[in-house]
Amino acid sequence: MVKQWFGVSRFVYNTTVKLLQDSSLKANWKAIKTDILNGLPEWSKSVPYQIKSIAIKDACKSVSNAKKKLKNGGGMSKIRFRSRKDTVQSCYIPKSAVKDVGIYHTILGEATFKEALPQSFGDCRLVFAYRDYYLTVPQDVPQQKSDNQGRVVALDPGIRTFITFFSECSFGEIGTAANLQIQKLCFRLDKLISKFTKAKCKQRRRMKLAASRLRGKIKNLVDEFHKKTARFLVDNFDIILLPTFETSQMSKKAKRRIRSKSVRQMLTLGHYRFKQFLKHKAFETNKVVMDVNEAYTSKTVSWTGEIIPNLGGAKFVKSPSDGQVMSRDMNGARGIFLRALVDTPSLKECIC
């Protein structure tokens, strides 16, 4: 029955998007809701009203955001239809339907949650991702109060080492060779996908389910890595200097200087998702994340100021003048730290 809810929600969303392709219609979900709901087929009548109603609202919001982006000069955005083949499906669940005994328990029956529900929460979404069901429950959490001790840390994101950090009193690496375990799972996934075309119907279905489980395992490993790293940073530092790590630009085929294997490792580690999550945790704990410029910090020897033009993919940086050697990632983090102290006037305000 839950799969039917996802299907009807998807059908209503796609119907609304198709209707709004007519430029004469405004994306006002309350104005078009009644006509759309009355025109739905008989097999969708048993699905709760609010699930269908909010699917219309979601479609109108997507169209409105695309129009707003075009108006503000952000370029044309194409609103795509939802597909039953999407790895993540979701539908709206009102908070009145969520009880300790389950979701819509009078329809679905009683169910148990892995975690206790908070005392007060808002409207939820039921998510089906990588063969598992999740109920996302929003709640209001007050911002934590903390004393600003002026502890500054610079981060250097990378591929071989996920994060290298450097501060006034400490330095280190987080996730040294973190991508090795993830890459093993990626290779297993590639090997499994390569067998799809040779498999028969039932075997192919089992393989697709196994591939979905592997994708979920990879995503869960990366998410856990992000959360533990963010927790360490916000617990030990007050100001976090994070360079603008342009993964989308670095991975474009036309201009990139790194191989496809490195591109895959970089995209799998999800540096942009980590950046967004870190900013969220920093706001929650009353800490500051500052976007800084990392230009030439890897090529510049941080203790002499010399520039090494042909550094390439070297793991270490060696000073031409004194012969001292430092890890490339550590040199980059130290360079970001020193550069931010000079080039970022707002840093002084945050420290004080």
Task: For each feature predicted by the language model, list its residue ranges.
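Residues on one face of amphipathic alpha-helical coiled coils
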Residues: 8, 12-15, 19, 58-61, ...
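Short coil/turn segments at secondary-structure boundaries
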Residues: 18-22, 29-31, 70-82, 199-209, ...
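Surface-exposed helix-capping loop/turn segments at secondary-structure junctions
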Residues: 21-25, 68-72, 282-288
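Stable alpha-helical structural segments in soluble proteins, enriched in small hydrophobic residues
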Residues: 16, 54-66, 330-343
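Acidic carboxylate diad motif detector
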Residues: 29-129, 264-268
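Positively charged, helix-rich recognition surfaces that bind polyanionic ligands
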Residues: 129-352
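Detector for conserved single-position "signature" residues within domains
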Residues: 1-41
